[in-house]
Amino acid sequence: MALLDLKQFYELREGCDDKGILVMDGDWLVFQAMSAAEFDASWEEEIWHRCCDHAKARQILEDSIKSYETRKKAWAGAPIVLAFTDSVNWRKELVDPNYKANRKAVKKPVGYFEFLDALFEREEFYCIREPMLEGDDVMGVIASNPSAFGARKAVIISCDKDFKTIPNCDFLWCTTGNILTQTEESADWWHLFQTIKGDITDGYSGIAGWGDTAEDFLNNPFITEPKTSVLKSGKNKGQEVTKWVKRDPEPHETLWDCIKSIGAKAGMTEEDIIKQGQMARILRFNEYNFIDKEIYLWRP
């Protein structure tokens, strides 16, 4: 089976009705398998080469996939998707050219692309890569609406915490081994958390001064606004000073109004904050038209 894009996968799955589909992070699985199969060798005095045993890497990859496939009885025999990242990234093209610019270049394992070419010919997996999308986006599009791809339920399998932002699926978070059941509400919460917190490794800063305290804010949101007063005593008597004061939101004020207010305190406009949210967003089914290859940027 050749490498597919989302449109081809959609057409191939038309009429299917599987109980579930396993949507795996192909980038991560392949990199881990190949890295574990690398070794140094010296073929002549004082000259060393980095090598990769592709047969060993292939076995590690197959064992990893098998271990996840058999994690639960209900997953056995489910179709498997391996998602991969395109060389062009829509976030750089449409949102911010500095996206992931802070990341140090990581050298691919030896023979990486040849290994992928062989993997893409395997019949037992659906290998999918979509123009301009990261593998994460491919996974998000499929998992947020598995019925469009011939399955009643999707399970995301990855070590990346950002998949907490994908709704209507289960997420096997390989870092912890926990299986998270995700709803629209929980996924939206995590997306706003990432928007506020930011992710320096991905090149977006969020709202300055928050970090992990974004969790407390989202659970107990408030409005912060500038209040100007005149000093009535002391050496600066008569001078105006401005302080940012917290208050409870009014009934007509939304969570987004609260987020805008803490952004304003940090010197950000609403569009600045939206830009953070767009970079934090893993695409969902209704945010990408895989027929026309059109991306619908997130807005609150």
UniProtKB/Swiss-Prot annotation:
<dbReference type="GO" id="GO:0003677">
    <property type="term" value="F:DNA binding"/>
</dbReference>
<protein>
    <recommendedName>
        <fullName>Exonuclease</fullName>
        <ecNumber>3.1.11.3</ecNumber>
    </recommendedName>
</protein>
<keyword id="KW-0269">Exonuclease</keyword>
<dbReference type="InterPro" id="IPR020046">
    <property type="entry name" value="5-3_exonucl_a-hlix_arch_N"/>
</dbReference>
<dbReference type="Pfam" id="PF02739">
    <property type="entry name" value="5_3_exonuc_N"/>
</dbReference>
<keyword id="KW-1190">Host gene expression shutoff by virus</keyword>
<keyword id="KW-0540">Nuclease</keyword>
<keyword id="KW-1261">Bacterial host gene expression shutoff by virus</keyword>
<comment type="function">
    <text>Plays an essential role in phage DNA replication by participating in the removal of DNA-linked RNA primers. Participates also in T7 DNA packaging, host DNA degradation and phage genetic recombination.</text>
</comment>
<dbReference type="GO" id="GO:0051908">
    <property type="term" value="F:double-stranded DNA 5'-3' DNA exonuclease activity"/>
</dbReference>
<dbReference type="InterPro" id="IPR029060">
    <property type="entry name" value="PIN-like_dom_sf"/>
</dbReference>
<dbReference type="GO" id="GO:0004523">
    <property type="term" value="F:RNA-DNA hybrid ribonuclease activity"/>
</dbReference>
<keyword id="KW-0945">Host-virus interaction</keyword>
<dbReference type="GO" id="GO:0099015">
    <property type="term" value="P:degradation of host chromosome by virus"/>
</dbReference>
<keyword id="KW-0378">Hydrolase</keyword>
<keyword id="KW-1247">Degradation of host chromosome by virus</keyword>
<dbReference type="GO" id="GO:0039657">
    <property type="term" value="P:symbiont-mediated suppression of host gene expression"/>
</dbReference>
